[in-house]
Amino acid sequence: MSVRRIAIRCLNYGKPQNPAYNASSSMRIEPIKRTGETRETKKARLVYQSRKRGILESDLLLSRFAKKHLDSLSDSQLDEYDQLLDEPDWDIYYWATKNYDVTPLPDRWKDSEILKMLQKDAQNEDREIMRMPEL
């Protein structure tokens, strides 16, 4: 029996980190809709999800954003931030850094107040050293 090697090439739409994405795929897993969650529980979960993304760049941006803004966000803004965290890590990173050539900004995020706040923080106008905030 002969073994044949087959080379598979995955197209990645210019994103070196993400697997190819098919928007029409029926295999999409919908985010969990949490009900009955207190504001404090939600904030604690969002802090955790902001810090434990798996990609250092996203961890730094999102954990600093959470530390700076979570306490002052309204309930609707917390919901919007929760929805943003359901997006893929590299997409959030590229949107936050306004690198739309790599990952175009979807229409659903074009008027996002939270994304605009995240983009402003990502500019780091104060030139702070980026590190994970203390818990």
From Swiss-Prot:
One of its GO terms (biological process) is mitochondrial electron transport, succinate to ubiquinone. It is found in: Mitochondrion matrix. The keyword Iron-sulfur does not apply. Keywords: Chaperone, Mitochondrion. Pfam families: Sdh5. It comes from the Eukaryota. One of its GO terms (cellular component) is mitochondrial matrix. SUPFAM superfamilies: YgfY-like. Its main location: mitochondrion. InterPro entries: SDH, SDH_sf, SDHAF2. HAMAP family: SDHAF2. Plays an essential role in the assembly of succinate dehydrogenase (SDH), an enzyme complex (also referred to as respiratory complex II) that is a component of both the tricarboxylic acid (TCA) cycle and the mitochondrial electron transport chain, and which couples the oxidation of succinate to fumarate with the reduction of ubiquinone (coenzyme Q) to ubiquinol. Required for flavinylation (covalent attachment of FAD) of the flavoprotein subunit of the SDH catalytic dimer. Interacts with the flavoprotein subunit within the SDH catalytic dimer. Belongs to the SDHAF2 family. This protein may be expected to contain an N-terminal transit peptide but none has been predicted. This is Succinate dehydrogenase assembly factor 2, mitochondrial.
